[in-house]
Amino acid sequence: MTNLSEFTFLSSDGKTQLHGMLWEPEGVAVRAVLQICHGVAEHIARYDGFARALNEQGIVVAGHDHLGHGKSLPEGGTPVYFGDGNTWNTVVDDIYVLHQRLKQRYPDVPLCIMGHSMGSFLTRTYLIRYPGTVKAAVIMGTGWQPRAAITGGLALANAIAAVLSLIHISE
């Protein structure tokens, strides 16, 4: 059984309310907490089935919709757009804010983090900026390429995301 709750918290941008979800197991001892960082054009609710399966194993799961994603997208906002300025670090700081909330709620339970696709890159940045804050990390759907390939790939991904955001938001 799962106790699912939704919550909001203020982004590190100081203006956007971020939507989050918390899946807590019922009737099973809590063994760990997993914080999920979703990919581009995704939202945290996509991980519902996965979270419920982990709950059966005693793992609490939590995550939030990053800036410009899911229910964190302000009315009239641009999908998959983090905002102006150094927003990559803002999103990483948002991950840390949720981490702190989870640590406060579960102080004696190992806290782990998982990032998928874009979330894997956010997670990698998080691990560099906030070392020692998690017991384990799962990095999936990620990559490593030479700088030139990454620069070109990021430019292409940004262009594709800009076009796709005009015509489709993932379900």
Can you annotate each of these PLM segments?
Residues 51-77:
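Conserved alpha/beta-hydrolase
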Residues 106-116:
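Alpha/beta-hydrolase fold nucleophile elbow
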Residues 115-119, 123:
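Gly/Ala-rich beta-loop-alpha elbow adjacent to hydrolase catalytic centers
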Residues 138-147:
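Active-site nucleophile loop of the alpha/beta-hydrolase fold
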